Amino acid sequence: MDKCRKANLYQKMGYYNEYILCKFEESLKYYKKALKIDQELVHPSFIASSLNNIGVIYEN
């Protein structure tokens, strides 16, 4: 699996844990994994999305 797909999978797992299971700590873990890959790929819109998702967790 390439890094881009892996980051996307982590985003989806984070979303599922956040909105379906209400497991915020678990969700945060996946969003941070996605962010790390996004930063390695230097993809600004993916980085922004990951940071936004992390911010929403902390806001709630």
Curated annotation (Swiss-Prot):
Identification of the protein by name: Uncharacterized protein RC0022
InterPro entries registered for this protein in UniProt: TPR-like_helical_dom_sf
